[in-house]
Amino acid sequence: MTRRWALPLLLIAFGLFYLLPLATHGLWIPDETRYAQISQEMLLTGKWASPHFMGIRYFEKPVAGYWMIAIGQALFGDNLFGVRVASALSTGLSVVLAYLLARRLWNDPRKSLASALLYMSFTVVALQAGYANLDPQFTFWVNLSLVALWFTFDCRTTRGQVLAWVALGLACGMGFMTKGFLAWLLPVLVALPYAIWQKRLRSLLIYGGIGVLVAILISLPWALAVHSQEPDYWRFFFWHEHIRRFAGDDAQHASPWWYYLPLLVGFSVPWVLLLPAGLKQAWQQRRQNSSGFLLLWLVLPLAFFSLSKGKLPAYILPCLLPLALLMGNTLVDRLAAGKTRLLAFNGVLNLVAGLLGLLALVYFQMKKPVYVDEPQHLVLVYVLLLGWILSNLLQAMRPLTLWAAPALGSFLLVALAPAALPNSVVYNKIPDQFIIDHVAELGQAKALLSNDLGAASALAWRLRRPDVTLYNTEGEVKYGLGYEDTAARKVDLNQVQPWIAEARKQGSIGVVMRVKSSDEEHEVELLPKDAKRYEQGNIVIFIIPQSQP
């Protein structure tokens, strides 16, 4: 029964809770609008080798992730679903990998289903599936490389080992073209100690060349093409995005070594209490090949990222698949032994968290409302909170038969939460929806201007026009603006009025401003007084009319 219905049930959950919500809310700034615009620009210009952000060189990431998002927009259109579908499909494929690897490790359909369901219902995994960035894609390629690595050691035939190494090389090549050299490093971190432990180092060195060759064959054509078009690409990408980020004294997002430990606990929601039990059982079974391999996969990348100076939460997403398998193994073993107290306590913990969330919402709505004149959003919040509470109540009351109930609460949370956001968040962080309301006037403008990269990329994506001039801002495009052919894409406070005076001779100017401080209010003051003004949250749209001859 479990074997027959496992994958269909997972597929139904994927469709209902991963795919359907993709188009229910606008694009977040700055990440989603950036990736949407860069990918759309590839479709518009045909420049597939060198990434450009609103026509400005942008060398912070390779191209494969943009290609996938561009394919989504090519197939489904320049819309919210088209932008996000690559993230959803990448996460769905990682769920399939969890199922297949669990089946290979234990040949127990219950453990296969439990492992895949736990991974799929990790709240952070499900949230990433509906968010347009490169992390879900990179996570899939790393997951595929390490699943393939297990098969390279586990296969007993030469043909099976060769095919596994080919798959590993494919994953490393695509992972490298998605986010860089980490796609090569992470499998090596696991492969070397595991091969030494298993006394298979000779086999690793003999057959490993197949994976290296495949990875090179996949990535080399693009590597040569981008070097030919942009000779400085590799210098910037290697030193800025790898050495400085992970080892430099001025590393981005510097955090202490223990930064990821509480995050790992948070990332295991709604199965938090299975985390210590899963790790304990894995340590007790560490001499078994399966547990030892999964522990290496979990611990070594986690240690590497903990020791690096620059840290972001998404870096440890590849650690969650082995964690889900270890926890799924423990869960099924406990169910088989009739030990359900831990699962009941897990349900109680989630239930208490849900009740506290509900009480906090009621309190703030009475004292300082989060939702003002938006009953539809408030209803959605109550629905998702009640769904969370009821699903975890079921696990607490019937842990033996309804052990999977928290997954439903997690799915409801990630499916409904984006559509239930208060207007105060939507108006300030999702400007593309406001831009849609005025797209006719903005689309007629001969020139476009914005003081914020997130708002500018939302404008460029919605209008399918990369030619947005940046007003007194540069941020992550500082490097690209240093090129002579794009230096004019930015105007500062002293240049903006002459620029407007010249630009409005040709036609109207569409301006999207993000006004959060007195500095930005001063930027607004320098705009012409005869402009039409539309305001929503901290996003302000101006339509500056064409000047009279």
From Swiss-Prot:
Reaction catalysis annotation: 4-amino-4-deoxy-alpha-L-arabinopyranosyl di-trans,octa-cis-undecaprenyl phosphate + lipid IVA = lipid IIA + di-trans,octa-cis-undecaprenyl phosphate
Pathway noted in the entry: Lipopolysaccharide metabolism; 4-amino-4-deoxy-beta-L-arabinose-lipid A biosynthesis
Transmembrane intervals: 9-29, 80-102, 112-132, 133-153, 176-196, 204-224, 257-277, 290-310, 312-332, 342-362, 377-397, 402-422
Pfam families linked: PMT
Keywords, sorted A to Z: Cell inner membrane, Cell membrane, Glycosyltransferase, Lipid A biosynthesis, Lipid biosynthesis, Lipid metabolism, Lipopolysaccharide biosynthesis, Membrane, Transferase, Transmembrane, Transmembrane helix
GO process annotations (BP): lipid A biosynthetic process; lipopolysaccharide biosynthetic process; protein O-linked glycosylation; response to iron(III) ion
Key word Cell membrane present: yes
Membrane topology: Multi-pass membrane protein
Location in the cell: Cell inner membrane
Top enzyme category: transferase
GO CC annotation, single: plasma membrane
This enzyme's EC code(s): 2.4.2.43
GO molecular-function term, one example from the UniProt record: mannosyltransferase activity
Family per similarity comment: Belongs to the glycosyltransferase 83 family.
Function as written in the Swiss-Prot or TrEMBL entry: Catalyzes the transfer of the L-Ara4N moiety of the glycolipid undecaprenyl phosphate-alpha-L-Ara4N to lipid A. The modified arabinose is attached to lipid A and is required for resistance to polymyxin and cationic antimicrobial peptides.
Classification via PANTHER family: MANNOSYLTRANSFERASE YKCB-RELATED, UNDECAPRENYL PHOSPHATE-ALPHA-4-AMINO-4-DEOXY-L-ARABINOSE ARABINOSYL TRANSFERASE
Name of the protein this chain belongs to: Undecaprenyl phosphate-alpha-4-amino-4-deoxy-L-arabinose arabinosyl transferase 1
